[in-house]
Amino acid sequence: MHVLLLNGPNLNLLGQREPGIYGCDTLATIETELTREAKADGVELVCFQSNFEGALIERIHQAMGESQGILINAGAYTHSSIAIRDALTGVAIPYVELHLSNTHAREPFRHQSYLAGRAVGVVSGFGAKSYSLALSGLVHHLRQGG
């Protein structure tokens, strides 16, 4: 099973940017740990991060025929990108939206997600553990025939 992990804008700054909200783990640390967890579960995880909407969309398109599932932390694009939603809808690959922080406990503009309505599920608010929980949920969904 092949799963694509997508991380959006500013997530390359994890560990430095607002640690009180996002925690102290770097993106590299999160990706390394999640890759280890995935491998132990028989899943090949490919990680991609970009601060650019078009690059994320291109990577979603490339996942067609290669990935059975997508994990996506679109960062601020969650609340603004119809284009990313359309790309995810267009490739028809099951995906889980995830966030480090509980977006519903933050500013009102973060309460809306353009991605959640088409997602298999949403995980938020558990810090770096959100990635592991999202992977577990997606793999379970895919193995159940989703």
Curated annotation (Swiss-Prot):
Pathway per the UniProt entry: Metabolic intermediate biosynthesis; chorismate biosynthesis; chorismate from D-erythrose 4-phosphate and phosphoenolpyruvate: step 3/7
GO function terms (MF aspect): 3-dehydroquinate dehydratase activity
Membrane spanning stretches: none
Catalytic residues in the record: Y22, H99
Keyword Nucleus applies: no
Chain positions of site Transition state stabilizer: R17
Listed Pfam families: DHquinase_II
InterPro entries per record: DHquinase_II, DHquinase_II_CS, DHquinase_II_sf
Keywords, ordered alphabetically: Amino-acid biosynthesis, Aromatic amino acid biosynthesis, Lyase
EC number: 4.2.1.10
Enzyme class of the recorded protein, top EC level: lyase
Domain of life: Bacteria
Binding site for substrate: N73, H79, D86, L100, S101, R110
One GO process term, biological-process aspect: aromatic amino acid family biosynthetic process
Catalytic activity field: 3-dehydroquinate = 3-dehydroshikimate + H2O
Matches recorded under CDD domains: DHQase_II
Known role: Catalyzes a trans-dehydration via an enolate intermediate.
Subunit structure, interactors included: Homododecamer.
Similarity-based family: Belongs to the type-II 3-dehydroquinase family.
Protein name, entry field: 3-dehydroquinate dehydratase
Biological source species: Synechococcus sp. (strain CC9902)
Gene name of the record: aroQ
